[in-house]
Amino acid sequence: HTRIIKQYQCDRKVGLAVDEWGTWYDVEPDTNPGFLYQQNTMRDALVAAINLNIFNNHCDTVCMANIAQMVNVLQAMILTEGSKMVLTPTYHVFEMYKGHQGAKQLESYAETTLLNHDDQAVPDLHVSASQQADGSILVTAANLNDTAAIPVTCMLGGAKPTGVTARVLAGAPAAHNTFAAPEQVVPTELNTSLTADGFTATLPPCSVAAFVVNQ
């Protein structure tokens, strides 16, 4: 889509609006099928991370993107039951990625290994990066491999890093938060080592990470 838009747009900039993206599964048992209430797991967190990385990587064209939907419907960020509320893994990905908003997108490239399933193949690592107004750099990454960790060496061309912090959201593909256990899947600190031009870390299987590099 972005290639077509860039090829044919004239003097006026044409934006791409991505409406109602997200996962759509069978509804939870014993719920009204018309309400589209579904559980939200680490699998959905990976879907959110991939999509948000794509949107950031194509932010010169993507002008708006709306997840379907925010509360209790489809790939919801929040689930409620009476007076109770639980934050889903998808919510935590949005929170970890919020530094991309209003920042300057940086070109990024990842050397990856393909994951093969039936006749489909996808990269095991998905990344995006942006620079904040204060000069810090946010790198977001998703490990799509649900059985193997990925050692990561990030090189930031032209940067002079002075420190790095990182958080990771990880768990089994079906891991999720419930009203009885609302913090089963939450971001935790990720051990990261600073290098002369970036950092190194290891992404757990089925995980989403956000690295903030100060310089």
Residue ranges and their predicted role:
Residues 14-127:
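Aromatic/acidic polysaccharide-binding cleft in carbohydrate-active enzymes
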Residues 6-11, 60, 159:
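Short helix-capping segments at alpha-helix termini
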Residues 121-160, 166, 209-212:
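Carbohydrate-binding surface patches
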Residues 3-7, 51-55, 82, 125-129, ...:
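Generic recognition of flexible, low-complexity loop/linker segments
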